Amino acid sequence: MTKRMITICVLAAMLLSCASCGSTETGNDETTKSGGTDTTVGDTTAEPTEYDKYPLPEKDMDGFNLRFCNYDDSWLTWTIKTLDVEEENGDKLNDAVYARNRRVEAKYNCQITEELVANPGNSMSGYIMSGDDLYDIIMVHDEAVSSLYCQGYLDSWDTLEFADTSRSWWDNNANEVFQIGGKQFAAVGDFTLSMVCRGFVMLFNKDMVSDLNLDESLYDMVRDNKWTLDGYASIAKNFVKDLNGDGTMDGNDQYATTGAVKLHFGSLVTGCGVKYISTDSEGVPQFAIPGNTYAFDVFEKIFNIHNGTNIFYNIVKADVHDGSNEATTFFKNKQTAFHGTSMRGVANFRDANFDIGILPYPKYDENQENYYILTSGGTVATIPVTLPEDRHENVGILLDALCRDSQQNLLPTYKEIVLKTKYARDEDSAEMLDIIFGSLTYDLGLSVWPQDTYYKYMESYLKMTDNFSSTTDKIKSIVEKDISDLVSSLDK
């Protein structure tokens, strides 16, 4: 018997034991006799939790196999994709995934399996066109999901009765974006860390910031609603230094930050609450930039902060995507005080020889209520149209069960152990992470059509040309066609 099967058997026995204990009769527990007088113990019943209010059915699935198709390690190395592991290996995240899956398997008498391929989206057409029933859930790169739906390969999530994506163990911010006209074509839940770890944050060198002797710490600026574009700019300019005194700012000098243009400037734009694609009152997407005075104010303010100031060093001038690896080296060499990275990328600085703090990207101004964290580039869950109807119930139950368990166990492991303890080096950064996790922001312009929206605006920052208005005019018809194609597919 394999270690996996032994674990499932032990967990199943424990679950049966707990159920037996829970149903044992205890007689008159609530009433006792004292001197001939009845004394009733006060009601100590706890308030029902969300889990209590929305229970899943108890069901013996008789070995049912929940089949995931996911990416192997040949691509998407920048995100955490793992949905199943064969055994524990001492890594806390690995072991949390293992324990979660074995608990769910034991509870429902089922199996959870994951087949890894180079690109699930690219290989989808062959087996779907032939009608093959190979997978229940296919994990897809967020940028590919609209195209796959428009080609008729994906089903709507309203076909899974028990996978209630409005519950807290699903990512409502993401699922609202992926729901159009009442139909949801992709979903994000706590069973996967892929999108969570793609939230972008701002790291800072605590020693370099401390040397400025600021009147208020960066953490307090976040708490006091003063971490704004103006606040960031006023601090960032102090780090620009011609280290070798040759009168030329280049790779030998010091800056506030550097990196991929799309990451730095995109995070600043999203941090101000700008959305490239919004929805109308009926849930239909619309291109949100044309005629949006606030969006243009944000674009131009960020442009003016950086134009000619050397706050940002454009280390790779070829395109908006490259520069992250070089930026990591600059930050470790103390040539930049700030560094933008995904939460997954925080792990790259375990060996840094200085203390690191973590911040959300700044707000537009103090009137902005919330922080917003750009989130894109991970995988989302999709349902193939080949999924037989008689599998829908079990698939929905098991997905929801995985999300519930992950909310209680996997996500806290990632937040508390992997991030707060292993990488973040102070309690203030741990508090910032709570703000960041609560501020993850999704946008069809970031996740589904970035090539036609988000990246186009980043070209202006790459070239440092203030042409946001002409860019909008140029891409308007393209974006509207993207939206029309997707909406038409949902109506079929």
How does the language model describe each region?
Residues 62-94, 110-114, 137, 257:
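Short, well-ordered beta-strand elements
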Residues 107-179, 212:
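Extracytoplasmic "Venus flytrap"/periplasmic binding protein-like
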Residues 350-419:
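Extracytoplasmic/periplasmic substrate-recognition and gating elements
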Residues 412-492:
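C-terminal capping/gating helix-and-loop segments adjacent to ligand/active sites or protein-protein/ligand interfaces
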